[in-house]
Amino acid sequence: MGSLVLPLSAVFCLVAHSASGSPIMGLEQSPLEEDMPFFDDIFTEQDGIDFNTLLQSMKNEFLKTLNLSDIPVQDTGRVDPPEYMLELYNKFATDRTSMPSANIIRSFKNEDLFSQPVTFNGLRKYPLLFNVSIPHHEEVVMAELRLYTLVQRDRMMYDGVDRKITIFEVLESADGSEEERSMLVLVSTEIYGTNSEWETFDVTDATRRWQKSGPSTHQLEIHIESRQNQAEDTGRGQLEIDMSAQNKHDPLLVVFSDDQSNDKEQKEELNELITHEQDLDLDSDAFFSGPDEEALLQMRSNMIDDSSARIRRNAKGNYCKKTPLYIDFKEIGWDSWIIAPPGYEAYECRGVCNYPLAEHLTPTKHAIIQALVHLKNSQKASKACCVPTKLDPISILYLDKGVVTYKFKYEGMAVSECGCR
């Protein structure tokens, strides 16, 4: 049996209807439900399709879009995302006119939690370790190292602390010996610190190089030195990097990348919307020779002008339309790895597509013919289906193997418009 593909928004419609426990929606049963089979009724009518198998395949489709092979297994306990990642999510979730520089943003935390900074002749060194994994098909747009600088000074005597900060990449020797390691300068800048705050360093080139090498661990070393000689700098204050474990000011490597999948996904969504049409045989033996273009346009015109009681009756509530459907990630057991949002309004398309089809439902030529055939002989063709014709994306903040990841536009998650197909 060939694979069955449905719009991604249908994943959560199915999960919502099949989830155990309290219902996701508190809506009363609509009168139109008498005329509409539930999902499991629909699929059991089709030979060889198992509902549970279908549901699992659709969940897999959702995970595949996020480049996940399975629901990420998380450590026990809730993971607190970096403050910066929450700020990004809230910024773009509340202001839809804002656009991030990339569709995917990942944050990698410092993995070296035991090494301590070392000071020698006025030079202070901080070791950092990042386990970086970025899919090869993504384009790294930008990468930045975020360090929280702690400024300690006598506010009565000095305006600030003058320091030079250099970011080195520690390159391992061929034989792995520490004596033969070399240091590559990634970025160097001068900072006049007046208050404790975040400082950002561009490490895009290095991150692109790391991406090509595949998932691997990379060691950095931060050097902080005074711009004055040691005698002049004595007592002027200190500038340090906050390295406290489990601190909201942990060093953070933030990678902005583009999966270049928007166009591809939108085309796939369009194909998914009309997949069921390809299964309907409209040859001359099973049905009738379809009308030519002129006759079809006339048929459409007649439908628009028709003011019969049927149209008025259908317009009262049971015609195809967008209805509320709130998805709560906790209800379906995905709150362990989806950080934000806790849920979202996905909407769904409900109702019937009786002939004649209204213009606002933007029916295809095929749907018009199918509705007409069903009207003449319901045994030959089923009614046209009420389905999403336009889908909107949502933003999502989630955990992928311990890496807090933000995806600005996860396509096909919310119904924008419904129609008959």
Curated annotation (Swiss-Prot):
Organism superkingdom: Eukaryota
Tissue expression summary:
In the embryo, expressed exclusively in the ventricular trabecular myocardium of the developing heart from 9.0 dpc-13.5 dpc. By 16.5 dpc-18.5 dpc, only detectable in atria. Highly expressed in the adult heart where it is found in the right atrium but not in the left atrium. Lower levels in adult liver and lung.
> Which of UniProt's keywords are assigned here?
Cell adhesion, Cleavage on pair of basic residues, Cytokine, Developmental protein, Disulfide bond, Glycoprotein, Growth factor, Secreted, Signal
Q: What happens when the gene is disrupted?
A: Mice die in utero between 9.5 dpc and 10.5 dpc. They appear normal at 8.5 dpc-8.75 dpc but display cardiac dysgenesis at 9.0 dpc-9.5 dpc with profound hypoplastic ventricular walls and absence of ventricular trabeculae and have a significantly lower heart rate than wild type embryos. Mutants show up-regulation of Cdkn1c/p57KIP throughout the ventricular wall while levels of Mef2c and Nkx2-5 are normal at 8.5 dpc-8.75 dpc but are down-regulated at 9.25 dpc-9.5 dpc.
Residues annotated as glycosylated? 67, 131
Where does the record place it?
Secreted
Q: Where are the disulfide bridges?
A: 320-386, 349-418, 353-420
What are the recorded GO MF terms, alphabetically? cytokine activity; growth factor activity; hormone activity; receptor serine/threonine kinase binding; telethonin binding
- Give residue ranges for the propeptide: 22-313
* One Gene Ontology term from the biological process aspect of the record: positive regulation of cartilage development
Per the record, GO CC terms?
A: cell surface; extracellular space; Z disc
Q: Which family does it belong to?
A: Belongs to the TGF-beta family.
Its name, as the record gives it, is: Bone morphogenetic protein 10
- Which gene underlies this protein? Bmp10
